[in-house]
């Protein structure tokens, strides 16, 4: 049994050595923007590509271009590999959709799956719109709220951002009313407040936005019966996705070997137990017969 367990353990070890790097090699890295993906004109932005796979190089590419691919050697810190790409002071020709890739030492010309796309937007190019709330900036809990973004400029699209959230909502501008173009953003029943801003843009330059509207603080008063967190609000019950991915992957790999080891131990213990019972069988029978004989003698004495 011992030789079999050792053999299976060796097979499993070499299988893991061959399979684990390939799985990690296929896993896509993550791409972040610092200080954020909405960048004012002439402001510096850094794009960070990172992964829990130990990539040797990272590549950064902007969609629609062929000569803008950047390549950096990855830094390995605390089980994470990363590279920081500085794209300089923000200009209109630097705005767009970016993705990054990773490569490992033994396959320098083969790349991982691409990261999720990251849209880098330049702001501050046009006149700022106005942002207002209906029925007002202070509402009762559960009361419906609509934010209206409007401008004298003929923007095709309006974008609404919430402080602390990564993504924006967008709506097409409606017909011109009283000399202004407007888009309404229904927020539904109010459960929590927040600070909002809006921007305007044109169809032919979707990554070039206007200046930000003045911030609008929406306050909610009262205690709603059912208050739900924002979809982007982190839950205390939700762990780090990277750590969960590694934990689940390791558990799946270990499970077959654990089952096999349990089966072999169970079989070995069963064989040992059966052998022990067979050795003790005759002695057990003799003991039972002796007790029966004593009982019969006792009964004979009682009735004599």
Swiss-Prot record:
Note the InterPro entries from the entry: Ig-like_dom_sf, Ig-like_fold, Ig-like_Receptors_ImmuneReg, Ig_sub, Immunoglobulin_dom
Q: Where are the transmembrane segments?
A: 246-264
Which residue positions carry a glycan here? 67, 84, 178
Q: Where is this region: Disordered?
A: 220-239, 275-304
Against Pfam families, the record matches this protein to: ig
Is this entry keyworded Glycoprotein? yes
Topological domains on the Cytoplasmic side lie at: 265-304
The keyword NAD is assigned to this record: no
Give the UniProt record's GO annotations in the biological process aspect. Answer: cellular defense response; immune response-regulating signaling pathway
- Record protein name field: Killer cell immunoglobulin-like receptor 2DS3
Q: Which organism is it from?
A: Homo sapiens (Human)
Task: Give the gene that encodes this protein.
Answer: KIR2DS3
């Amino acid at each position: 049994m011992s030789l079999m367990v050792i053999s299976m353990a060796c097979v499993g070890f070499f299988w893991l050595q061959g399979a684990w790097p390939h799985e990690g090699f296929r896993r896509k890295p993550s791409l972040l923007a610092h200080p954020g993906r909405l960048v004012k004109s002439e402001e510096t932005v850094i794009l960070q590509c990172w992964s829990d796979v130990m990539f040797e190089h990272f590549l950064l590419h902007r969609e629609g271009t062929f000569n803008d691919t950047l390549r950096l050697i990855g830094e390995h810190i605390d089980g994470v590999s990363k590279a920081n790409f500085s794209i300089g002071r923000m200009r209109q020709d630097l705005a767009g959709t970016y993705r990054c890739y990773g490569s490992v030492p033994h396959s320098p010309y083969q790349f991982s799956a691409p990261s999720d796309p990251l849209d880098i937007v330049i702001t501050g190019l046009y006149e700022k719109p106005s942002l207002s709330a209906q029925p007002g900036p202070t509402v009762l809990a559960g009361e419906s709220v609509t934010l209206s973004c409007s401008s004298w400029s003929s923007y095709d699209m309006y974008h609404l951002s919430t402080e602390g959230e990564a993504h924006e909502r967008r709506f097409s501008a409606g017909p011109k009313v009283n000399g202004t173009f407007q888009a309404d953003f229904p927020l539904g029943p109010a459960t929590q407040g927040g600070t909002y801003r809006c921007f305007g843009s044109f169809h032919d330059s979707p990554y070039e936005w206007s200046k930000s509207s003045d911030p609008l603080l929406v306050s909610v008063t009262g205690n709603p019966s059912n208050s739900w967190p924002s979809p982007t609000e982190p839950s205390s019950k939700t762990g780090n996705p990277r750590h969960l991915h590694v934990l689940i992957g390791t558990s799946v790999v270990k499970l077959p070997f654990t089952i096999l080891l349990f089966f072999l131990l169970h079989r070995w213990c069963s064989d040992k137990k059966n052998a022990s019972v067979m050795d003790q069988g005759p002695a057990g029978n003799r003991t039972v017969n002796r007790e029966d004989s004593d009982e019969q003698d006792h009964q004979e004495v009682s009735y004599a």
